[in-house]
């Protein structure tokens, strides 16, 4: 009579090791002692159980938290766009007109939590002004994280009575993150000769240089439309917007416009911008893009296609829209 195959006993041992590891919570060293095998053998038994399909791991979102936790969408966004991390904000009720900081409270809280987790004390953090970054600064918690300096990435001075929030962001981040502030005392756009003159100014040139080499950059995104912050703040008019759109512009970061593939749109306006160039944004290893609202969908998709962000914080509607695109 033929000797019985050793395979069933091998599987029994693998199943036993997997049960002790996944269900009973034992370490590999404890499993090795329990089964009378070496620690490497215990590890191989657990791996064999997984390889043979004896282990099924299921991550379950509690039913009462399904409106606030979106792990599946986050994972798919990371895989689809090659992101370091995606955070989909919960369904907290935000009260406020579109474009106002209150309308970004949920993504602001989520982005603040992500930022505090990613910051290290030696980092220089750059930001672009806007309601999204105002919401982030508002949501920062004292004593959780720190960085070396906070630098303004785009000019904010304007003749219009428009509140950019740049001073609030600088002051709040400096206080909460115990950081040095580096202001950019310049307008967002100026004529080319003025821009050239400003670049020779030691304060402005040092600020732009610090921004270009920031370890962390956090920014909202603007649409190339009258729904954008730049139009609302009178930095652009309809004629300028029409020209940008005719050249393929779909969105902007720091006043610098890009097309549907996230590539810079080279116009006369680009020569007038006083802000960190998009190539420096793309080169930064920790870029956090905040997106919320239907008006930002196409610009967000373009920025992700162009690898202008490594980390994304968005609302669930934006996440689902992005995942529906091909």
Each model region followed by its residue ranges:
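Conserved S-adenosyl-L-methionine
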Residues: 143-148, 306-308
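Short Gly/Thr/Asp-enriched flexible loops that form oxyanion-binding sites at enzyme active sites
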Residues: 132-143, 229-238
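Conserved beta-strand segments of alpha/beta enzyme cores
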Residues: 84-87, 149, 180-182
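Catalytic or ion-translocation cores adjacent to nucleophile or general acid/base/metal-coordination motifs
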Residues: 149-157
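Conserved phosphate- and dinucleotide-binding cores of soluble alpha/beta proteins
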Residues: 2-18, 22-31, 36, 41, ...
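Glycine-rich beta-strand-to-loop/alpha-helix junction loops that act as flexible
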Residues: 89-90, 126-132, 292, 316
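HTH-adjacent hinge/linker in prokaryotic transcriptional regulators
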Residues: 8, 44-124, 138-145, 158-163
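Residues that mark the start of a beta-strand
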Residues: 122-124, 149, 286
């Amino acid at each position: 009579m033929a000797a019985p195959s050793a395979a069933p006993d091998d599987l029994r041992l693998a199943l036993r090791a997997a049960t002790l590891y996944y269900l009973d919570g034992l370490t590999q060293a404890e499993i090795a002692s329990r089964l009378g095998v070496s620690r490497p053998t215990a590890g191989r038994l657990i791996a064999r159980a997984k390889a043979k399909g004896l282990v099924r791991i299921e991550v379950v979102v509690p039913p009462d938290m399904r409106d606030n936790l979106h792990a599946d969408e986050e994972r798919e966004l990371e895989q689809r766009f090659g992101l370091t991390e995606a955070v989909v904000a919960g369904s907290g009720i935000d009260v406020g007109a579109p474009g106002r900081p209150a309308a970004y409270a949920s993504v602001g809280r989520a982005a603040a939590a992500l930022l505090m987790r990613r910051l290290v004390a030696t980092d220089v953090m750059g930001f672009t002004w806007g309601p999204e970054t105002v919401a982030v600064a508002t949501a920062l918690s004292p004593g959780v994280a720190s960085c070396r300096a906070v630098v303004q990435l785009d000019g904010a001075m304007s003749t219009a009575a428009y509140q950019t929030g740049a001073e609030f962001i600088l002051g709040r981040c400096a206080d909460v993150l115990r950081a040095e502030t580096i202001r950019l005392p310049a307008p967002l756009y100026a004529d080319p000769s003025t821009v050239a003159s400003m670049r020779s100014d030691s304060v402005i040139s040092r600020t732009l240089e610090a921004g270009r080499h920031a370890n962390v950059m956090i920014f909202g995104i603007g649409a190339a439309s009258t729904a954008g912050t730049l139009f609302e703040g009178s930095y652009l008019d309809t004629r300028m917007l029409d020209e940008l759109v005719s050249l393929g512009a779909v969105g902007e970061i720091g006043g610098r416009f890009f097309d549907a593939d996230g590539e810079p749109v080279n116009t006369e306006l680009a020569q007038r911008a006083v802000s960190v160039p998009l190539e420096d944004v793309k080169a930064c290893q920790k870029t956090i893009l905040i997106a919320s609202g239907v008006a930002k969908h196409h610009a967000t998709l373009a920025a992700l296609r162009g690898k202008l962000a490594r980390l994304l914080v968005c609302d669930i509607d934006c996440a689902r829209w992005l995942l529906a695109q091909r």
